[in-house]
């Protein structure tokens, strides 16, 4: 009776462990862009009318001012032009050789079996190591995304963030961007290159049948983690 209960308990524990492993395998990874991806402009207070044609209060669109973003809620176009190439090669070749010779005038009787009839000892040693390694990476990302100003810093820089979602058949693609923009780098077309954005975080992910097919199964991942090889 106890053996049956023990077997059932082991089966239950194994089932719970498999469910936990599957839950960990299906857990979504943490996105790079942690801040909100949009912001609404704050409403301007409406002041009393100061004239019949011209008003002294802020109207939102000054007459002698360009259209560059400078307030929370303004939009900005990011031209993503990322092209990163990196390579690294390293090699090591070392060798070491040592010789030592010892001579004894007399050998204790207790150690006579170690030296035999000779009273000399020679020690030789050699050590050689050769190693080489190399790594290379190439990434290219070109595209366009429109972001929103989330915050205006004290020095005038703009904290921007945005997201673009595209659903195609049974899959969905997400492009997220965040960073800090210097207003002086914004062109007359209200655009800025991604290479001129500080603390830029660019993320391109997808969800759907194609993304699921590229992921390793939870049981295979479990055995891969516990395997000592």
UniProtKB/Swiss-Prot annotation:
GO cellular component: bacterial-type flagellum basal body, distal rod, L ring; cell outer membrane
Lipidation (N-palmitoyl cysteine): 24
Main location: membrane
Alphabetical UniProt keywords: Bacterial flagellum, Cell outer membrane, Lipoprotein, Membrane, Palmitate, Signal
Residue numbers with lipid attached (S-diacylglycerol cysteine): 24
Membrane topology, as annotated: Lipid-anchor
Record has Lipoprotein as a keyword: yes
MF GO annotations: cytoskeletal motor activity
Residues annotated as signal peptide: 1-23
Subcellular location: Cell outer membrane; Bacterial flagellum basal body
GO BP of this protein: bacterial-type flagellum-dependent cell motility
Alphabetical list of Pfam families matching this protein: FlgH
PANTHER family per the UniProt record, alphabetical: FLAGELLAR L-RING PROTEIN
Cited function: Assembles around the rod to form the L-ring and probably protects the motor/basal body from shearing forces during rotation.
Stated family: Belongs to the FlgH family.
Subunit and partners: The basal body constitutes a major portion of the flagellar organelle and consists of four rings (L,P,S, and M) mounted on a central rod.
Entry protein name: Flagellar L-ring protein
Source organism of this protein record: Cupriavidus taiwanensis (strain DSM 17343 / BCRC 17206 / CCUG 44338 / CIP 107171 / LMG 19424 / R1) (Ralstonia taiwanensis (strain LMG 19424))
Gene symbol of the encoding locus: flgH
């Amino acid at each position: 009776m106890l053996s049956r209960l023990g077997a059932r308990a082991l089966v239950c524990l194994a089932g719970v462990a498999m469910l936990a492993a599957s839950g960990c395998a299906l857990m979504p990874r943490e996105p790079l862009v942690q801040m909100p991806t949009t912001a609404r402009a704050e409403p301007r207070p409406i002041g009393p009318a100061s004239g019949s044609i011209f008003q002294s209060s802020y109207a939102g669109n000054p007459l002698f001012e360009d259209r560059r973003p400078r307030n929370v809620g303004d939009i900005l176009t990011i031209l993503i032009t990322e092209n990163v190439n990196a390579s690294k090669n390293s090699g090591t070749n070392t060798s070491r050789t040592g010789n030592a010779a010892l001579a004894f005038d007399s050998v204790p009787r207790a150690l006579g079996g170690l030296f035999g009839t000779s009273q000399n000892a020679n020690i030789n040693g050699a050590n050689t190591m050769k190693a080489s390694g190399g790594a290379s990476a190439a990434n290219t990302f070109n595209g366009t995304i429109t972001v929103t100003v989330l915050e205006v810093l004290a020095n005038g820089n703009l904290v921007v963030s945005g997201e673009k979602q595209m659903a195609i058949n049974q899959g969905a693609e997400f492009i997220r961007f965040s960073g800090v923009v210097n207003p002086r780098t914004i062109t007359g077309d209200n655009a800025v290159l991604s290479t001129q954005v500080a603390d830029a975080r660019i993320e391109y992910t997808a969800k759907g049948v194609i993304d699921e097919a590229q992921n390793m199964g939870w049981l295979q991942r479990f055995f891969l983690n516990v395997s000592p090889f």
